[in-house]
Curated annotation (Swiss-Prot):
UniProt keywords, alphabetically: ATP-binding, Biotin biosynthesis, Cytoplasm, Ligase, Magnesium, Metal-binding, Nucleotide-binding
Binding-site positions, Mg(2+): T17, D50, E115
InterPro entries tied to this protein: DTB_synth_BioD, P-loop_NTPase
Pathway recorded for this protein: Cofactor biosynthesis; biotin biosynthesis; biotin from 7,8-diaminononanoate: step 1/2
Subunit structure: Homodimer.
HAMAP family xref list: BioD
Record's subcellular location: Cytoplasm
Taxonomic placement: Bacteria, Pseudomonadati, Pseudomonadota, Betaproteobacteria, Neisseriales
GO biological process: biotin biosynthetic process
UniProt-recorded name of the protein: ATP-dependent dethiobiotin synthetase BioD
Binding site for substrate: T42
Length: 215
């Protein structure tokens, strides 16, 4: 594993931040040089909350790249989709700034995990979806799913979008932290999605995030 990977989710609040932190921690433990980035953080002022969570899970302090703003190039105060948060803050989202920051991180680290906002179809600007940006940059995707009710539908829609846009799925991460309280639903979601991943993206990895992994 080497290069830049885009971490997206099948929905909002699916566990992307925790999953990104845990994956980075595991890579660190394997001796990899890894950093996480939150290119667009909304609902914050000066520091990206998600980056702070990543560092806590990774067990490391804020890095020099964090202090330089490379891991959090765009921060908006209103907690909403990037296109709306930017509009309400009265300024445009700077895609060149984001691209440059990611490139600088990629030059310094072996692996860069880029955590997106929400799912693949979230608008970054009025004219650009997250999935458009991923395709433009050529990033493989790490997709976060779960065992909660509705996850099968949302995951298959995400699969269809990735195929339509010709984007490589690196791995599907099944997040047990958001499992349904109904054990039948959670287990069936796991079994079904594991089979569909093999059919739809045979080269993609299946990963599971246990409830204790983020502790």
């Amino acid at each position: 594993m080497k290069g830049v990977y885009f971490v997206s989710g099948i929905d909002t609040d699916i566990g992307k931040t925790i999953a990104t932190g845990v994956l980075a921690k595991q890579l660190l433990q394997q001796g990899k040089s890894v950093i996480t980035q939150k290119p667009v953080q909304t609902g914050c002022q000066n520091i990206a909350d998600d980056i702070a969570v990543h560092r806590k899970i990774m067990g490391i302090p804020m890095q020099e790249a964090d202090k330089q703003g490379l891991t959090m190039p765009e921060i908006f105060s209103y907690p909403a989709s990037p296109h709306l948060a930017a509009r309400l803050d009265g300024r445009a989202l700077d895609l060149d700034k984001i691209r440059t920051a990611t490139q600088q991180l990629a030059a310094q680290y072996e692996i860069v995990l880029v955590e997106g906002a929400g799912g693949l179809m979230v608008p970054l600007t009025e004219n650009l979806l997250t999935i458009d940006y991923i395709r433009q940059q050529g990033y493989p995707v790490i997709l976060i799913t779960s065992g909660r009710l509705g996850s099968i539908n949302h995951t298959l829609l995400s699969f269809a979008a990735l195929k339509q846009y010709g984007i490589r799925l690196h791995s599907l991460v099944f997040n047990h932290i958001h499992d349904s309280r109904d054990a039948h639903v959670a287990q069936d979601s796991l079994n079904y999605l594991k089979c569909r991943l093999k059919d739809s993206f045979p080269e993609a990895e299946w990963l599971e995030l246990a409830k204790t992994d983020a502790v």
